[in-house]
Amino acid sequence: MRTLTFILIGAFLLAAPIVQAQDNSTDILIQVLLRKGILSESEASEIRQEVTAVAEAQKAEIVDAAVAQVERVYVSSPSVPMPSKLSNLTLTGNARFRYHYENAESRSGENNDRSRWRYRIRLGSIYQFKESAYSLGVQLETATSNDSNNANFGGFFDKSGGGMSVGRIYLNYKGEDWNITFGKQASPFYMPKMLWDGDLNIEGLSESISRGAWTFTAGQYIIDEENESKERIGGQSVTDDALLMAQAKWTNGEGLVFAPVLMATTGGNSNFSESGTFSGANSVQYFHDFAVAGLPFEYGFKTGNGQKHKLFGAWGMNLKGDELVNDPDSPFFGGSTGQSSKNQFANLGYQMGSAKKAGEHQWSAEYRFMEAGAYTPNLSDSDWAKGQLNQGGYVINYKQVFTDFFNLSVTYLVGDSIDDDYMASPGNKGNTQVLLIDGVVSF
């Protein structure tokens, strides 16, 4: 900026004396010619106007030349380049502001109303190694819960909820038609939100391979790390617990998708001796009797006016659901043995529109049904029914994308108990209602 100032000042200083000298010489000459009677007053006035016009043009030429010189200097000046080692780095992030209302009635009808203003921040980066199929991903997130990145406003301006935690850290290898990821990562599986909370980041190894219309995905994930040296006779198990998953996804390329999935845990009642406990909506530190088979699906299509539509859903069951609710040592135990038919889940929904670009909007309506022994609250959508099982109800959503960086959505979730006689804590609530109003800024 200092160089620009000096050049422009110099241009005006250079132009000023030239124009001034021309003006003085012209006036003296015109006065002499007038006194000798060679020029009339009208002729002298015309000559002055012509000389002034020429002088202004010369001054403009000098200034234009100076400006052109400045532009050449600044265009040719090299910009500060990104270090070569960071040239393959992609940065992402978003901030969400939320109004959150919830009420989960007890079976006696007692209300538990709560409303909060909340925020969430995610800052991510992916580094693609040069001339390599490997990439490294890192994401920082607010809060520490496994199924929520939300922090609350209202701590008298404190900063206790605004700390950043490592949400993802993973190494990925991407081949021509196969993919391997190790670390703390987003789920690679095609799952409805009812079965998989969007804030969960799994920890372990994921593999996928594509063959024509099929994509096969498998995963082996650590859910509890234990120190085997602490095992005591008659004490709790100190064996590491794992979640195993496998899925075969098929699509016809025209909007139809079927994706059968199998899920199972290897452990039982964990004590988290090394990793500490985890917090989540209605979380249960119990991983026994979980062997789930499910069939997520969707069908997307367009009508004659180009409007996008989608039907989606899932059906499945926990093959060990009856054992789960009949085991007196299980937190899912319903109070008496011999219980049955509590092991199924399902959802069915419809969406119109696709809110991905500025000016687009969508709305959707969905029915959900999840019995007491059908699944685990450790993985399911933490917003619906406050993570409760033994619930059936609806989810209605509207989303509008206003700009490339801002969207607004409103979601209403309502449910009620399926079996009023079931009183175990994972599914002992009555009517549940949740209202979410989200404003998201992406950058």
Question: For each of these PLM feature ranges, what is it?
Answer:
Residues 1-5:
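Positively charged n-region of N-terminal signal peptides that target proteins for export
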Residues 6, 19-108, 443:
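N-terminal periplasmic/intermembrane-space "pro-region" immediately following the signal or transit peptide
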Residues 6-15:
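Bacterial N-terminal signal peptides
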Residues 14-15, 19-20, 171:
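Hydrophobic alpha-helical segments of integral membrane proteins
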Residues 49, 255-258, 304-311:
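Short, structured loop/turn "capping" segments at alpha-beta junctions
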Residues 85-101, 112-232, 239-265, 346-379:
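Outer membrane beta-barrel
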Residues 234-236, 240, 259-291:
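A conserved mid-domain beta-alpha-beta active-site/ligand-binding segment of alpha/beta enzyme cores
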